Amino acid sequence: MQIRTYKIKDICDIQRGRGITKEYIKNNSGKYPVYSAATTNNGELGFINTYDFAGEYVTWTTNGYAGVVFYRNGKFSASQDCGVLKVRNKEINAQFLAFALSLKTPQFVHNLGSRPKLNRKVVAEISLDFPPLEVQEKIAHFLKSFNELSSQLKAELIKRQKQYAFYSDYLLNPKHSQGEEYKLFKLKDIAKKILVGGEKPSDFQKEKDQVYKYPILSNSRKADDFLGYSKTFRIAEKSITVSARGTIGAVFYRDFSYLPAVSLICFIPKPEFNINFLFHALKATKFHKQGSGTGQLTMAQFKEYQVYIPSLKKQQEIAATLDPLYYIFANSNWGIYKEIELRKKQMQYYQERLFQWIENQKV
């Protein structure tokens, strides 16, 4: 089997996106995606009413999370932090190119400075091996199947998130009380305790063992994103944590002993209130920072926030409905997360071995 080696500049037209701001997207809203240097949400920055590219392309991120490669097929625009390749060689499959290039780009990312970069001049000189077009198409089709399955699983996850949001909005709204009386309470009036995390302890370790077994919690968007583990704990009761810095307003239910740090707010309600209900009520609360710059949610500010609360029986009923809906998508150990991770690892495994096989075919 003949293997041909080409530099990107020899088989592609190399372009770059243009300056498209969030303000521009807001003022020119439409149906055509704008791809950026982002790596989440398929790299989408937003949608506008015009497009700069139409057809099959390969894009890569030039700044920040530089070197992440995407296959594009459709009408779209790209920001100035997004490089765009248009294949001009009829013996090259664009999707195969995307898979091949994604294995190579990490080697060429320039990491000096605060933002990693991968510019057009560097990409132009990257060399890739290409088998006959028919083989390229078969490999691309095979690897694409893993991406398609992952996309289906992620769509199911989004569906579950929207389902929870719908029922949460409906059940927590006093307008849908169906005769049930809701009363407005300040958080300070329903709290048994409200505590704030201090500095990260000097005596801790990253890994959990029999001695260092209590998680150190701080401000994070992930429930299980721990700073490390401590020999001691401060909170032993069931509680609700609320991020007060950075990821302000990230709310999690905690049913284990832990040590809070870095101004994390810990809320323990009085026993006459259902903690599971209050968890969902606080998740629905829009917390705001105080002060300029990064700012923070202060203890005094937190205490003054208000929530509508029905009878204890109604609280229990609402919690019984919302709990399973929430934990279906929030639990990282749930099957769909494991399935997504498995498909990702499978694709990486076959991708690496298929392209190693191609390299081994070179004479």
Swiss-Prot record:
One BP term from GO: DNA restriction-modification system
Superkingdom of the source species: Bacteria
UniProt cross-references to InterPro entries, sorted A to Z: Restrct_endonuc_typeI_TRD, Restrct_endonuc_typeI_TRD_sf, Type-I_RS_S_subunit
Induction: Detected at low levels after 6 and 96 hours growth, there are fewer copies at 96 hours (at protein level).
Swiss-Prot/TrEMBL keywords: DNA-binding, Restriction system
One Pfam short name: Methylase_S
Family: Belongs to the type-I restriction system S methylase family.
Subunit architecture: The methyltransferase is composed of M and S polypeptides.
Function per UniProt: The specificity (S) subunit of a type I methyltransferase (MTase); this subunit dictates DNA sequence specificity. The single R subunit has multiple frameshifts and is probably not expressed.
Protein name per Swiss-Prot or TrEMBL: Putative type I specificity subunit S.MpnORF507P
Lineage: Bacteria, Bacillati, Mycoplasmatota, Mycoplasmoidales, Mycoplasmoidaceae
